Amino acid sequence: MRIVFMGTPEFAIPSLEMLVRERYEVAAVVTQPDKPKGRGKKTAMPPVKEFAIKNNIEVLQPSKVKTPEFVSTIRELRPDLLVTAAYGKILPQEVLDIPPYGCVNVHGSLLPKYRGAAPINWAIINGEKVTGITTMYTDAGMDTGDMLLKAEIEISDDMTAGELHDKLACLGAEVLRETLKKIEDSTLQRIPQPHEQATYAPMLDKTVGCINWSKSARDVHNLVRGTNPWPVAFTYYKGQKMKVWVTSVLDEENHNFTPGTILKVGKDGLVVACGVGKVVIKEVQFDSSRRMTVEEYICGHKVGEGEVLGQ
């Protein structure tokens, strides 16, 4: 089967690796243009491009996909199937109509829940216990096409978005492999999505990470997990922005403390009151320094019990 693969970030790599390993004919890889990255704003290649170059696969990086030129380019590649995994652009119907087997997408949620750009993060932020992978036929909407295969994975209480991302990326490759086998032997069933059950996972920005200490300890902990490694949860301490990398839930009991109050300072972390319950902050980072444990931070900085975070 001749495939054009479309993907951009690390999430897409295991699926592309699987296609190469299983000896599918990958005619080309389509990925987003190179972009400035990091503090130095040096131009960086998408991870999928790096993999394609190492494996001698043609790379296309269109700035727009809704152009006659791009449609013509895909048509000239004569794919039997398009495969997408976190490509980052919605494909026009003209492109989807080119391959005889259509377009299969690898999505990081159990559709119709968490349609959109950041399903992994929002599943954790919202406190889900289970998520998974759905392969689906792509249509012109945003993750609205017929579902094909699903696989579930449990989300542990302390799992971060980064950890879940890596597990789902690998699971996605396995589900894609099974999907392609069923396409080849004509045993694949299409399941329309119950659109009335759809929920959405919009793209994250840095403001999402702002901790509201009036929320429950569980909600605060979920936000910290769901924004690790990006954009990272944060609060303010003595007027300085403080990133909060790692927390744990100490208890979920009612109390009379002002939310955000530091109740205890110790080598195990900062115990902080939330709207309901308390969390322990274990790892922090200030703009001028590296990420560090609270034990490391309090060795060189005085942190007082009774001080209030978020100010």
UniProtKB/Swiss-Prot annotation:
List keywords of the entry alphabetically: Protein biosynthesis, Transferase
Keyword Cell wall biogenesis/degradation found? no
Q: Which Gene3D superfamilies match?
A: 3.40.50.12230
Any one Gene Ontology MF annotation carried by this entry is: methionyl-tRNA formyltransferase activity
SUPFAM superfamilies referenced in this protein's UniProt entry, alphabetically: FMT C-terminal domain-like, Formyltransferase
Pfam families from the entry? Formyl_trans_C, Formyl_trans_N
Provide the E.C. number(s) assigned to this enzyme.
2.1.2.9
Q: Which reaction does it catalyse?
A: L-methionyl-tRNA(fMet) + (6R)-10-formyltetrahydrofolate = N-formyl-L-methionyl-tRNA(fMet) + (6S)-5,6,7,8-tetrahydrofolate + H(+)
Which Gene Ontology cellular-component terms appear in the entry? cytosol
Which residues hold (6S)-5,6,7,8-tetrahydrofolate?
Answer: S109, L110, L111, P112
InterPro entries tied to this protein: Fmt, Formyl_trans_C, Formyl_transf_N, Formyl_transf_N_sf, Formyl_transferase-like_C_sf, GART_AS, Met-tRNA-FMT_C, Met-tRNA-FMT_N
NCBIfam families the UniProt entry points to: fmt
Q: Which family does it belong to?
A: Belongs to the Fmt family.
Q: What is the documented function of this protein?
A: Attaches a formyl group to the free amino group of methionyl-tRNA(fMet). The formyl group appears to play a dual role in the initiator identity of N-formylmethionyl-tRNA by promoting its recognition by IF2 and preventing the misappropriation of this tRNA by the elongation apparatus.
Record's protein name: Methionyl-tRNA formyltransferase
In which organism is this protein found? Answer: Acetivibrio thermocellus (strain ATCC 27405 / DSM 1237 / JCM 9322 / NBRC 103400 / NCIMB 10682 / NRRL B-4536 / VPI 7372)
